[in-house]
């Protein structure tokens, strides 16, 4: 079944929080890794917005996760 935009946003939000907490980073620290503000990171984690593709790829590389994992397509 194809996921709709809201489902993808929810899964991505959950994965961003999970990855950040696994690495024991604050929202401010994560933002600095990708040249974004704490406010931007908080917005992603609240599901209000999504990181742009380049930023998401940078986070995935830092966290050693695949893009499929970030989008909730693999465990």
Question: How would you name each of these model-derived features?
Answer:
Residues 20, 31, 60:
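The alpha-helix within a helix-turn-helix
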Residues 54-69:
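DNA major-groove recognition helix of helix-turn-helix/homeodomain DNA-binding modules
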